């Protein structure tokens, strides 16, 4: 998990509650702010909640992620975005990110169903290309997403759709979108996870190895393709053993002769020292192949561990 600290508060006004959440990510090695140097880059929102749900405004994680107050993909894998390159986002093509200038809605649960939605008027206020762009104008990249979830006993399932309207000053062929179906089922002796995704013209798909194909940015591949993952979590020796395999197959929609294939395999163990403190260790192998005029294959083995304390 990424290092962070935050402030959170609510006030009950009778029929509604108003609140705020400020969450700051930082690099524990040198104390520098993460998320592009933002003080509260993980989340910075005000909210109003009542019987019909909660409305958020500010900066927060997308519906098509496991982050923040409206992210819906936390239950599709035992390894979320906090596991960085080993996380399940490596086998998706969704805009798994945080967005500035956003408004979002989270519904109450009704008969096991719930829904989240969001819209960003300007996705990244610190982007060099969009720093002067006016909010909700064609020169600004805008983002919309909606998801439907269902929880009933041991079943937890979600369906999420997102759509990115790229700013006019970018060089993309068209707008991007993705759809993700996933969830988990608790069998008691083990919990099984699964996810499938299809995406088109996405530029925020995880690119760990930064193949030097697009001169504008190491991450701006206009990707089209699909991905899937299977995982499990099993109680072992007082903790949880976790494992997942993920695959993504995609091509660059601008340069059709460029294909990307990626495998993720991850294992981990989490052990609770108390109700608020736990330790974890992870390890995995990631392979990404690029088939173009030059063929590149990169393999990487990653290991890590950490301590989590919830205040």
Predicted regions and their residues:
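Outer-membrane beta-barrel "beta-signal"
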Residues: 298-311
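Outer membrane beta-barrel
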Residues: 1-123, 140, 148-156
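Residue-level detector of the transmembrane beta-barrel scaffold of outer-membrane proteins
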Residues: 17-21, 54-56, 114-116, 156-158, ...
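Outer-membrane beta-barrel domain signature
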Residues: 29-36, 89-96, 127-137, 167-172, ...
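Membrane-spanning beta-strands of outer-membrane beta-barrel proteins
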Residues: 2, 39-41, 98, 110, ...
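Detector for outer-membrane/organellar transmembrane beta-barrel domains
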Residues: 139-141, 145-266, 271
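Outer-membrane beta-barrel pore domains and translocons
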Residues: 23-25, 60-64, 118-122, 151, ...
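Structural signature of outer-membrane beta-barrel channels/translocons
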Residues: 8-12, 49-51, 106-109, 149-153, ...
